From Swiss-Prot:
Belongs to the Integrator subunit 3 family. It is found in: Nucleus; Cytoplasm. Component of the Integrator complex. The core complex associates with protein phosphatase 2A subunits, to form the Integrator-PP2A (INTAC) complex. Component of the SOSS complex. This is Integrator complex subunit 3 homolog. Residues 1-23, 523-671, 689-801, 813-922, 1116-1177, 1489-1520 are annotated as: Disordered. The gene is ints3.
C-alpha cells in the first residue's frame, strides 16, 4: 500500500523533447504577460527597447507598488544623494536615466481608468528629475517617431495623456512632441485608431486653447494638419466617421483662420489649395472663401488678395508633416537608393502598405507635394542611375483611379508653376513636372498629353478667371526658367505636334509661341527674323525691307561712379549760344561743299532718299524685354518713341543701361558694328583702333569677316548709316531718352534746327552705330569721297553733359579737333587734324590704349571736298577681332585739365593755338574719356525732383544724396535761418513739409531697419551718420551744456529740475520723421551717449568722429590707424592729435577735388562696413566681432566715467516729453503705466532689432532711475533680450553699485517673475544677488514672502539661487532657521542642503539654535500641540541623514551634536520605534540602547541595502 501511494504521488515522467517544448511555451507566455508595450504576434520576439525599459522598471517596481508618494520621493532623493556623494558622474547619470525610463514605462503601462496613479508617477518624476524632464521628453519623442504605430491601445492612450500633462505644465518640449504625434494621424485612413487619435488631439487643443494661442509657431502646423484631415473626413464612407467630430474640426479650423490668420499666412500657397478644395465641399468654408476673396483686409491688415499667399512658397515642414516618419523613410529610400528600372517592386510594397483602399488616394497629392518641394536630390544623385523624381510622380498619377483625385494630384504637381518667380521659388520645385512631360513623350504620350491639356485647358483658361493674367505670367516664368537653366534644351519635343493633335497644338502655340524654338539662346534672334519678315510683307514701304530694329548697346560698366552735376542757368544759356554757332558753321560748310561723288553701281540699290526717313524712324525702336517677367514684347505692336527729356532733367546715360532696367536686351544678345566688335565697348577704344578709310578702298577680307561674325552672332542686320537714324525733324535732344534709340546729335530743345538738305545722301554699306551716350555728336563716314575732313561741332561742357567729339576723334586715326566750350568749364585742348593715308588698319595684336604716346602737333590740312551733310563723318574700318581695352587705372582719374581760351565765334574753322609744351594732350583726351564714362552711372533712387522751395536753402548739387553727408549741415542751418526770418506761417509749413519729405526719402536706407542693409554695431556707435546732422540742429550745443550743468546740480535729487530746450522748427521735422521711422528714437539715444563728454569728438568738417584716446590693446591702434586713413568721411580715429591733422588735410583735398570725392561720399555705408572688416588683430587671436564689442564697451565706459551722475540722456528725454506735449509729469509708481516709459521700451525694442540694446541697459538704468528702477515691463525686456556676456557685464556693474534694478519693488518683481520662463528667472535672481551684495539683507528680509510663493517644481532655478544666497549671507537668524526647517516635504533637498551647510560652516550659531529648540521642547509639557515638536522631529531627522552621509568623515561630533539633549529627547518620546527610526543618531548618543541594533546601521556605513528596516522604503520613511 505504501509503494502504491508513493507511485501515485510521483509526477508523470516526460521526455526531454516534451520538457523543452514546455519550457519554450512557459517562456513565451511569460513574455506575453510581461511585455505589453508593443503589439506582437505569437512568433515575434520581444522588442529590444522594451526589454531594456522593462529592466529599468523592475529596479523601482517594488518601490512604486508599496510606497506612498512622499516615501518614493524621499527614497529617490536619498539614493541620488548617496550616488552623487561617491563622485562617480557616470554612475549618477546611469541612475538618473534608469529611474526616468522606469517612470516612463510605468506611466505607459498604467491603466487609463487609474489616472491618479499615473499622475502620482509623473509628479514624482518631476520632483526627482535634474534636467527639467529633458531626457524624459527625448525618450518620448523617439518612441513616438519610431514605434508609435506598434504601441498597444493602452500605451497609445497614455502617450496622449503624457502630452496633455506636458501642455498643462507648459513644458518647453510640448510643441515638438505635439508636432511629431500629429504626423501619425494618417491621411486617407479611417481606422478606429486613427480617428480616435485625431479626436483626442482635437479635444486636447480645445481644452488648452489659451496655451495654443500663445504658440504662434505651432498654430499653422495644427491648422494645416486638420484642414487636410477635414478634406478626408468630408469624403468619408458612410458610417466611418462621426459627424459631431467633423463639426468640431470645422469649427476649430474656422476659429483659427478668423482669429489667427496672420500666423497662418506662413503656410503659403498650400493653404489656398486646401481652402479652395474645402470651399466646394462645405457651406462654412464656402462662406470663408467668399469673404477671403471679397474682404481680405478683414482677415489681416496688410492682406489685400490671396495672390499674396499664392506667391509664398510653402515651408518644407508643413508638407513633411502629412507623411508619417515611416512613410517618409520609405519614400526617401526609393528616391535615394533604388536604381531606375528596379523600382517596380518597391512601389508595389508601398502600395500594399499605404495605398490599398480607395480612400487612401487622398495621400497621393501629399506625396507629390513632398517629392516636389521637400526632397531636392543632390548632384551626385542627379548624375547617377537612381530613379528620378519625375518617374515616381508619374507612377503615382497612374495609380489614381478617381478622376477627381487625379486632377487634384496634377494641381499639386503644378501648384508652384502658377505664380512662379525665379528670385523667390526654387527651380527644383518645377523640375519634376517638365521632366515628366519630356520623359513621357516617347513611351507614355498619353501622360504628356494629359499634362499639357491640364496646363492649357484648366490652369490657363478656367482655374482662376479673376487672376488669369498672373497665372499665365507665372507659367510663362516657369517655362522660361527651365529653358534658361538647361533643364530641357527645347520645348519642341515637349510639345510635339503629331502627339498633341491640331487643336491642342494651336492652343500651345497661342500661349507658348515664343518658346517653340530649338534653343532658348536664339529666342531674341527669332524675334528679329519675324520683324524682318513683317517688313518684307509691306509693299508700300520697300525701303523698310532691309531696316533692322535698332537695339540699345549693352550697358557698359563705368570706370567710377562720379555723378554729373546739374547745369546752372548761365551754363545753359552758354550752351544755347554755342548751339546757334554750330548751326551757322554747318550751313557755311554746306554751301562750300562740292556735289557728292556717286557710289559704285553695285551700291546704288542700298541708298535711300532722305524723304523716306520719317517712315523708317518707328522701326528703329528696340524690342522691349520685360526683365521682371521674362516676356518678349509682341513684335506686331509698333514701338513708340518716348519724347525727349527737358534739358533741366537730370538723366544719366546709364540709367537705361542699369541691370534693373526693363528695356535691356538679354545677355545672349549683342550688338555688333561692321567690324564685328561689340559696340558696348567702343567708348574704350584708342585713337589707333579705327582708321578713316573710304568705302571704295576697303579690303575684301574686312567685309567678309564682318559678315561671318554677323552670321555667327545674330541674324543679318540691314546696314544703316548713322544719319538715317536721326529724328525726322532734326530736333536733337540734349539727353538720351530711356526707351529711345541712341541720340546721334546734340542740340538744345529751344533751338529749332533746319531740315537736312535734299542732296544729303549717305550710303549705308559699312556704317553702324558706334556709341550710346547722352549729349553726344557722332560723325558718320562719307564713302563717296577719297579724303575728307570731319568738322566737329562746338563742344558744350556743362556739369551734366559731356561732349563726344574727343572720343570720336580718338576713334579716327586723326588727332581730335579743337572744341568750343563754356568759359566756366574745363575744356580739352585738341590739336588740329591732319589728313593721313587711308590705308592704316590696326591688327588685333595692336595695343588699344596707349596713354604714354603723345601725338605731335599737326598743321592745318588743305580744304578738301566734303559730302553735303549736316553731320560730320567718320570712317570705321577695323578688324573684327579687336580686343576690348583694359580698364583704366585709378591714378588716371586725377589728371588736371587747364581750360584754354575759347576761340572766336566769327571764325569757327580756325584752328586753335597750339597747346603748351607741358600739357599732355593724350592725357587730356584720356581724361575726357574717363570723365564721360564716369558720368554715366546714376542710381535710379537718387533721380528725384528737388522742389523749387528747397532751392532757397541750398543748391541742387547740395541736395544730391551723394553729397548730403557733407552738405546737410549747411542746409539745415539755412533752413533754421530761413524759418526765423519768414513771417508767413504758410510758407514756413510748406518749406518744412518739403524738407521733411526730402529727408524721408534720402534717409530711408539709413533709418529703415533691415538686417540685410543695417550697418554693423561698430558703425552704429562709432561712425558719423547723416541723421546726426538733424540731431545737432535740433539739440544745439548750447542747450546741451545747459542740460549737463543742470543735471549735475540736481544729481542728488531723484528728478531733474530743468530740461534742455530744443529748436522748434527742427523738432517738427524730427517728429514727422519719427512717425515714419521709429528707429530714430534709439538713434537719438545712442547719439546722445556717444557725443557726451568722454565719447566721440566731432571734427572740423562736421561729418567725422574721432575715437577718444582710451587705453586699450595696441592691436586696436594699428588697425584703427589704417581704418581712419582709408576713410575720408566716416572714419573713426584712434590717435586724436595725429589723425586730426590728417583729417584736416583730407578736408583741404576734399575741397580741391570735390568731384572726385563725391564717389566716396556715395559709399559711406560701404566704407563703414569695409572699415570694420579691415580691423585685424595680429597680436591676439581675437575675432573681428569681439574687437568691435570691446571697442563699443570701452567707449561706453569712457562716457560713464567722464559724466559721473550727470544725465547724459537729457536730449532724448526732452524729445519724448515734447512729443507728449510738454515737460514730463512726475513719475508715477513703477508698476503704473507711464507714457514716457512706454516710449523708452518701444525705442529699446527697435534697438534690440539691430543688437544695440544690451549695451544701453546700464546707462538707461542710471539715467532714468526714477522711471525704470522697479519697472517690471522694462526688466522683462532686458531679461528676454540679454545675452550671457552682457548679463555678466550688467551684474558686475550692479555689484559695483553703479545702478539699481529692483529698488523698493523687489517683492512685486519677484512675484511677477514666477510666471516667466526658467532662464529669465535665473537671470533675474543673479541680478538680484548682485544688488543684494551692495544693499545687504534685501533677500533675507523678504525670505518668508519668497519661500511662501515658491513652487519647487516650476521654480527650481529660483530655489537654487536662493540656496546660494542663504549660504553666503551672514544675516540669517533663528526665524530663518526655524522657517526653513518647517518647510514641507517638497523642499527636502533645499532644507537638507542648508541644514548641512549651516551645521558645517556656521557650527556655533546653528548649534545654539538647535539647543534652544531642544530646551524649549524639554521644558514644555504640552509639547504635542505646538510647532516645537515638529521642529524637534525635523532636527532629529536631518541629524540622522547628516550622520549617515558624513559619518565616514573625521568630524568632531561633540561640536555639532549635544548628546545629552538629544538622548533626553529620544528617551522622552513615547514612540517605541524612535531608536530604530533614527538609528544613526541613536548609535552616537545612546550606544548602550543601540546595542540591539544591527551593525550595518552604524553611521559609518554608507550602504543600507543589507538593513532589515531599509528593505521596505515605506516603513523606513514613515512619518509619525
Amino acid at each position: 500500500m505504501m509503494n502504491q501511494q508513493q507511485q501515485q504521488q510521483q509526477p508523470p515522467t516526460t521526455s526531454p523533447t516534451q520538457q523543452q517544448q514546455l519550457t519554450q511555451l512557459q517562456t513565451h507566455q511569460y513574455f506575453q504577460n510581461k511585455f505589453k508595450l508593443f503589439y506582437k504576434r505569437e512568433l515575434d520576439e520581444a522588442d529590444p527597447l522594451e526589454i531594456y525599459w522593462r529592466e529599468c522598471y523592475d529596479k523601482i517596481e517594488l518601490l512604486l507598488l508599496n510606497s506612498s508618494e512622499a516615501e518614493i520621493n524621499n527614497y529617490l532623493i536619498e539614493k541620488s544623494a548617496s550616488v552623487e556623494s561617491s563622485g562617480n558622474n557616470d554612475q549618477s547619470n546611469k541612475f538618473h536615466t534608469e529611474v526616468t525610463i522606469g517612470f516612463l514605462y510605468a506611466i505607459l503601462l498604467g491603466s487609463p481608468q487609474n489616472i491618479a496613479l499615473s499622475h502620482q508617477y509623473f509628479k514624482s518624476l518631476t520632483f526627482f528629475t535634474k534636467d527639467s524632464l529633458a531626457l524624459f521628453c527625448s525618450l518620448l519623442k523617439k518612441l513616438i517617431a519610431d514605434k508609435f504605430q506598434k504601441l498597444n491601445d493602452t500605451p497609445r492612450q497614455q502617450v496622449v495623456w503624457i502630452i496633455n500633462e506636458l501642455i498643462a505644465t507648459n513644458h518647453q518640449d510640448c510643441e515638438s512632441v505635439t508636432s511629431i504625434i500629429l504626423r501619425h494621424i494618417y491621411g486617407g485612413n479611417f481606422t478606429s485608431k486613427n480617428l480616435s487619435l485625431s479626436h483626442s488631439m482635437l479635444n486636447m487643443f480645445l481644452t488648452h486653447r489659451q496655451w495654443l494661442n500663445s504658440r504662434p509657431l505651432l498654430i499653422p502646423t495644427i491648422l494645416y494638419n486638420f484642414l487636410r484631415l477635414i478634406q478626408d473626413h468630408i469624403s468619408r464612407p458612410q458610417g466611418l466617421h462621426n459627424p459631431t467630430h467633423l463639426k468640431d474640426e470645422i469649427n476649430f479650423c474656422l476659429d483659427l483662420l478668423k482669429n489667427k490668420f496672420q500666423e497662418c499666412l506662413v503656410i503659403g500657397r498650400d493653404l489656398i489649395r486646401l481652402l479652395q478644395y474645402l470651399s466646394t465641399k462645405t457651406i462654412e468654408f464656402e462662406q470663408l472663401w467668399k469673404d477671403l476673396n471679397s474682404k481680405p483686409t478683414t482677415f489681416a491688415p496688410g492682406y489685400y488678395d490671396i495672390i499674396q499667399s499664392m506667391k509664398t512658397p510653402t515651408p518644407k515642414h508643413f508638407l513633411q508633416s502629412r507623411l508619417s516618419p515611416e512613410m517618409e523613410l520609405q519614400v526617401l529610400y526609393i528616391l535615394k537608393e533604388v536604381k531606375f528600372g528596379n523600382q517596380k517592386r518597391y512601389q508595389q510594397w508601398f502600395v500594399t502598405k499605404y495605398l490599398v483602399t480607395p480612400e487612401s488616394e487622398s495621400l497621393i497629392p501629399d506625396i507629390i507635394r513632398y517629392i516636389c518641394c521637400v526632397y531636392h536630390p543632390p548632384n551626385h544623385v542627379l548624375c547617377s542611375d537612381i530613379v528620378p523624381r519625375w518617374a515616381i510622380i508619374g507612377w503615382l498619377l497612374k495609380h489614381c483611379k478617381s478622376d477627381a483625385w487625379r486632377n487634384y494630384s496634377k494641381l499639386s504637381l503644378f501648384l508652384d508653376w502658377l505664380y512662379f518667380e525665379p528670385k523667390i521659388d526654387s527651380i527644383m520645385n518645377i523640375e519634376p513636372a517638365i521632366l515628366l512631360m519630356a520623359g513621357s513623350v516617347k513611351k507614355y504620350a498619353d501622360m504628356t498629353i494629359d499634362l499639357v491639356e491640364f496646363i492649357v485647358g484648366t490652369l490657363l483658361d478656367s482655374y482662376d478667371i479673376q487672376r488669369k493674367d498672373a497665372i499665365r505670367q507665372g507659367i510663362h516664368n516657369s517655362f522660361a526658367t527651365v529653358l534658361e537653366k538647361g533643364v530641357v534644351q527645347s520645348l519642341s519635343h515637349v510639345f510635339p505636334p503629331d502627339s498633341l493633335g491640331p487643336s491642342l497644338f494651336e492652343k500651345v502655340k497661342h500661349y507658348f509661341h515664343q518658346f517653340l524654338t530649338n534653343s532658348p539662346i536664339h529666342q531674341l534672334h527669332s524675334q528679329q527674323q519675324q520683324l524682318q519678315q513683317q517688313q518684307l510683307q509691306q509693299p508700300q514701304q520697300p525701303q523698310q525691307q532691309q531696316q533692322p530694329p535698332q537695339y540699345k548697346p549693352y550697358p557698359q560698366q563705368p570706370i567710377n561712379k562720379q555723378l554729373p552735376l546739374q547745369m546752372s542757368p548761365q551754363q545753359q544759356s552758354q550752351q544755347q549760344l554755342q548751339q546757334q554757332q554750330l548751326q551757322q558753321q554747318l550751313q557755311q560748310q554746306q554751301q562750300q561743299q562740292q556735289p557728292p561723288q556717286q557710289p559704285p553701281p553695285q551700291q546704288q540699290p542700298q541708298q535711300q532718299p532722305p524723304q523716306q526717313q520719317p517712315q523708317q524712324q518707328p522701326q528703329q525702336q528696340q524690342p522691349q524685354l520685360n526683365i521682371s517677367t521674362g516676356n518678349l514684347p509682341n513684335i506686331q505692336q509698333p514701338m513708340v518713341k518716348s519724347p525727349p527729356l527737358s534739358s533741366n532733367t537730370l538723366v544719366s546715360p546709364t540709367s537705361s543701361s542699369s541691370p534693373t532696367s526693363s528695356n535691356l536686351p538679354t545677355n545672349n544678345s549683342r550688338v555688333l558694328n561692321k567690324s564685328g566688335v561689340d559696340i558696348h565697348h567702343v567708348s574704350n577704344l584708342s585713337p589707333q583702333v579705327i582708321s578713316q578709310k573710304p568705302q571704295s578702298q576697303q579690303t575684301p577680307s574686312l567685309h567678309s569677316s564682318s559678315q561671318s561674325v554677323l552670321q555667327q552672332k545674330s541674324p543679318p542686320l540691314k546696314e544703316t548709316s548713322l544719319f538715317e537714324q536721326q529724328q525726322p525733324s532734326q530736333q536733337l535732344p540734349s539727353q538720351i531718352v530711356k526707351n529711345s534709340p541712341p541720340n546721334l546729335s546734340m542740340t538744345n530743345e529751344n533751338i529749332s534746327n533746319p531740315p537736312p538738305p535734299p542732296h544729303a545722301k549717305i550710303s549705308s554699306d559699312h556704317a553702324s552705330p558706334l556709341i550710346n551716350s547722352s549729349n553726344s555728336n557722332i560723325t558718320t563716314p562719307n564713302p563717296d569721297s577719297q579724303s575728307q575732313i570731319p568738322i566737329p561741332p562746338p563742344i558744350s561742357q556743362s556739369p551734366s553733359t559731356k561732349n563726344i567729339d574727343v572720343i570720336m576723334s580718338e576713334l579716327n586715326d586723326e588727332p581730335p579737333k579743337l572744341s568750343k566750350s563754356s568759359p566756366t568749364q574745363s575744356n580739352i585742348i585738341v590739336p588740329p587734324p591732319t589728313h593721313k593715308p587711308p590705308q592704316t588698319t590696326i591688327s588685333s595684336s595692336s595695343p588699344l590704349l596707349q596713354p604714354q604716346t603723345q601725338p605731335q602737333p599737326q598743321t592745318q590740312p588743305q580744304p578738301q571736298t566734303l559730302q553735303q551733310s549736316t553731320t560730320p563723318s567718320l570712317s570705321s574700318s577695323s578688324t573684327p577681332t579687336i580686343p576690348i581695352s583694359p580698364p583704366l587705372l585709378p591714378t588716371q582719374l586725377e589728371i588736371d585739365i587747364q581750360p584754354p581760351p575759347p576761340p572766336p565765334s566769327s571764325q569757327p574753322l580756325q584752328p586753335p593755338p597750339p597747346p603748351p609744351p607741358s600739357q599732355n594732350i593724350k592725357d587730356e583726351t584720356l581724361n575726357s574719356l574717363i570723365e564721360l564714362n564716369s558720368s554715366i552711372k546714376l542710381d535710379e533712387e537718387i533721380k528725384m525732383e528737388i522742389p523749387d522751395i528747397l532751392l532757397t536753402i541750398g543748391s541742387k548739387p547740395q541736395f544730391q544724396p551723394t553729397n548730403i553727408t557733407i552738405t546737410l549741415g549747411s542746409i539745415l542751418s539755412n533752413f533754421n535761418e530761413k524759418i526765423s526770418k519768414q513771417p508767413n506761417i504758410t510758407l514756413q509749413n510748406e518749406l518744412t513739409d518739403s524738407l521733411t519729405q526730402y529727408l524721408s526719402q534720402v534717409l530711408k536706407p539709413e533709418l529703415q531697419i533691415d538686417l540685410s542693409t543695417t550697418p554693423s554695431l561698430l558703425s552704429l556707435f562709432c561712425n558719423f551718420q547723416v541723421i546726426h546732422h538733424i540731431f545737432r540742429a535740433t539739440f544745439s550745443p548750447t542747450d546741451n551744456s545747459i542740460t549737463t550743468t543742470t543735471t549735475t546740480t540736481a544729481a542728488a535729487t531723484t528728478t531733474t529740475t530743468t530740461t534742455p530746450t530744443i529748436v522748434k522748427p527742427m523738432f517738427n521735422i524730427l517728429k514727422e520723421l519719427y512717425k515714419i521711422y521709429p528707429s530714430i528714437g534709439f538713434k537719438i539715444m545712442i547719439w546722445s551717449i556717444i557725443t557726451s563728454p568722454g565719447g566721440l569728438n566731432i571734427t572740423n568738417n562736421g561729418c567725422t568722429y574721432i575715437y577718444p584716446d582710451i587705453e586699450c590693446d595696441n592691436s586696436f591702434s594699428n588697425s584703427d590707424d589704417n581704418e581712419s586713413t582709408n576713410n575720408n568721411n566716416n572714419g573713426v580715429e584712434q590717435k586724436p592729435q595725429q589723425q586730426q591733422q590728417q583729417q584736416q588735410q583730407q578736408q583741404i583735398n576734399e575741397n580741391t577735388h570735390n568731384n572726385n570725392n563725391n564717389n566716396n561720399n556715395n559709399n559711406n555705408n560701404n566704407n563703414n562696413n569695409n572699415n570694420e572688416n579691415n580691423i585685424t588683430n595680429n597680436s591676439q587671436n581675437i575675432t573681428i566681432k569681439e574687437e568691435s564689442i570691446f571697442k563699443i564697451e570701452k567707449l561706453l565706459e569712457s562716457v560713464q566715467d567722464s559724466n559721473g551722475n550727470r544725465n547724459i540722456l537729457g536730449n532724448y528725454l526732452n524729445f519724448h516729453s515734447n512729443l507728449l506735449g510738454g515737460q514730463p509729469p512726475p513719475p508715477p509708481p513703477p508698476q503704473q503705466p507711464n507714457k514716457i516709459v512706454e516710449q523708452i521700451i518701444s525705442d529699446c525694442i527697435e534697438a534690440n532689432n539691430v543688437g544695440a540694446f544690451n549695451y544701453l541697459v546700464p546707462i538707461l538704468y542710471k539715467s532714468f532711475s526714477n522711471l525704470l528702477v522697479g519697472n517690471s515691463d522694462f526688466l522683462y525686456l532686458v531679461l528676454s533680450c540679454i545675452n550671457p556676456r552682457q548679463h555678466f557685464r550688467i551684474c558686475n556693474k550692479i555689484s559695483m553699485g553703479e545702478f539699481r534694478v529692483f529698488g523698493n519693488e523687489m517683492k512685486s518683481l519677484i512675484s511677477q517673475s514666477f510666471k516667466w520662463e526658467s532662464f529669465e528667472q535665473n537671470y533675474l535672481w543673479q541680478m538680484l544677488i548682485a544688488e543684494d551684495s551692495v544693499y545687504s539683507g534685501m533677500i533675507v528680509k523678504e525670505y518668508p514672502f519668497i519661500i511662501s510663493k515658491l513652487d519647487p517644481y516650476n521654480n527650481s532655478e529660483v530655489l537654487q539661487n536662493l540656496t546660494i544666497t542663504l549660504k553666503e549671507t551672514k544675516f540669517y537668524d533663528f526665524n530663518i532657521f526655524s522657517e526653513t526647517l518647517l518647510l514641507n516635504d517638497y523642499f527636502y533637498t533645499f532644507v537638507f542642503c542648508l541644514f548641512s551647510f549651516w551645521l558645517k560652516n556656521n557650527t556655533t550659531q546653528t548649534f545654539n539654535y538647535i539647543n534652544q529648540i531642544f530646551d524649549f521642547y524639554l521644558s514644555n509639557n504640552n509639547n504635542n500641540n505646538n510647532n516645537n515638536r515638529k521642529l524637534v522631529e525635523r532636527i532629529l531627522y536631518f541629524y540622522n541623514i547628516f550622520l549617515k552621509k558624513y559619518g565616514e568623515e573625521r568630524i568632531k561630533w561633540s561640536d555639532m551634536i549635544d548628546s545629552d539633549r538629544v538622548s533626553k529627547v529620544l528617551q522622552r518620546s513615547t514612540n517605541s520605534n524612535l531608536f530604530q527610526k533614527y538609528s544613526n543618531l541613536g548609535s552616537l548618543v545612546l550606544p548602550s540602547q543601540s546595542s540591539n541594533i544591527k551593525n550595518d546601521n552604524n553611521p559609518t556605513l554608507s550602504k543600507h541595502q543589507n538593513s532589515d528596516d531599509d528593505s521596505n522604503p515605506k516603513k523606513r520613511f514613515r512619518k509619525e
